[in-house]
Amino acid sequence: MQYKKETLLLILLAILLALTQRYSRTKDHLQKMYTCWRDHLEEPQLESWFNPKKRPDVIATTGWLAPVLWEGTYDREVLEQYYKRLNITVGLAVFATGNFSSESLRRFIKSANKYFMVGYNVIFYILADGTSNLPYLELGPLRTLKMWRLSGEEMTYEDSNLRNMNNMRYKIMEHIQYEVNFLFVMTANQIIKNHFGVETLGRSVAQLHAWWYFKQPREFPYERRRKASAFIAFEEGDFYYHSAIVGGTPLDVLDLIEHYIKGIIDDRTNELSSTYERHLNKYFFIKKPVRVLSPEYNWDPRFKTPPEIWHIKVAWQPRIT
């Protein structure tokens, strides 16, 4: 009898192994098919859809020749012709944690449903402490939503960031990288006010900090302690990036997260602590983004809008009292 049980168990394990191998081969085959199809379509050259000369009043190109997206510099229709044929899916992840307001989340998703990647497949990922206080969210066509409960506990603000990014790392590795071609991670206390389209897509996407864009690099609040992982010297640096929006391919977003987690671990070894935003700035100082979003994508409406900003794309939500 024992022999039969062991034989049956071995057979079941063999079947599971075969199914796993088949799934892996199918997944690899689908990825290769997409890569092959993508490679047969020539991606538009930068000069065919982006013209920095149309905005001489702003920094429209970085020192490493990445476009800084301002209203008037890009032609979305050229890129639409390319991405429509690829039938891409874009992910938008948001954390609903701590003292977040369900009304703020509802406003954010409602605005994203209206303006984020219109005409493309979009998956909204909500990572929450729990789902009991999440609002009802009605979505349009080509939009789906997934909710995940965050695992782990946090004690401080930075512990919360670390917990969030650990969860995001796991979800990218286990799910997201197989579901979307591009991924954005945003904070829920924003609202999208104008079209957030395919001009923002790229291998890695960084958001300029609206306040620090108008300051000199020496004034930027980089990590200045030499022993800290996020250290950037006073004579170095080009931009200061905001943590409210980050994007790219799932694997590039994963690389950023792993850089942050490693930096946190290294700092704790040296009894140091730094913010997620400073680690993010160190990452983009080392690995330059291929798309940079202007302050139009990160504006605080409490401040007077400067003439450089023609159309606010993303704004901070007013605090709900």
From Swiss-Prot:
Miscellaneous comment as given in the Swiss-Prot or TrEMBL entry: This gene is not expressed in humans.
Residues annotated for substrate binding in this entry: 95-100, 187-189, 209-212
A GO BP annotation: lipid glycosylation
Catalytic residue list: 277 (nucleophile)
Swiss-Prot/TrEMBL keywords: Glycoprotein, Glycosyltransferase, Golgi apparatus, Manganese, Membrane, Metal-binding, Signal-anchor, Transferase, Transmembrane, Transmembrane helix
Catalytic activity: a beta-D-galactosyl-(1->4)-N-acetyl-beta-D-glucosaminyl derivative + UDP-alpha-D-galactose = an alpha-D-galactosyl-(1->3)-beta-D-galactosyl-(1->4)-N-acetyl-beta-D-glucosaminyl derivative + UDP + H(+)
Residues in the Lumenal compartment per record: 25-321
InterPro entries: Glyco_trans_6 (IPR005076), Nucleotide-diphossugar_trans (IPR029044)
Cited PANTHER family: GLYCOSYLTRANSFERASE-RELATED, N-ACETYLLACTOSAMINIDE ALPHA-1,3-GALACTOSYLTRANSFERASE-LIKE 1
Gene name of the encoded protein: Ggta1l1
Topology in the lipid bilayer: Single-pass type II membrane protein
One Gene Ontology cellular component annotation held by this UniProt entry: Golgi cisterna membrane
Written domain comment of the UniProt record: The conserved DXD motif is involved in cofactor binding. The manganese ion interacts with the beta-phosphate group of UDP and may also have a role in catalysis.
Essential cofactor(s): Mn(2+)
GO function term, MF aspect, one: metal ion binding
Role of this protein: Synthesizes the galactose-alpha(1,3)-galactose group by catalyzing the transfer of a galactose residue, with an alpha-1,3 linkage, on terminal lactosaminide (Gal-beta-1,4-GlcNAc-R) disaccharide borne by a glycoprotein or a glycolipid.
Annotated cofactor note: Binds 1 Mn(2+) ion per subunit.
Keyword Signal: no
Protein name according to UniProt: N-acetyllactosaminide alpha-1,3-galactosyltransferase-like 1
Keyword Protease among record annotations: no
Entry EC no(s): 2.4.1.87
Pathway: Protein modification; protein glycosylation
Glycosylation, residue list: 87, 99
Positions in the Cytoplasmic compartment: 1-6
Record-stated family: Belongs to the glycosyltransferase 6 family.
Membrane-spanning ranges: 7-24
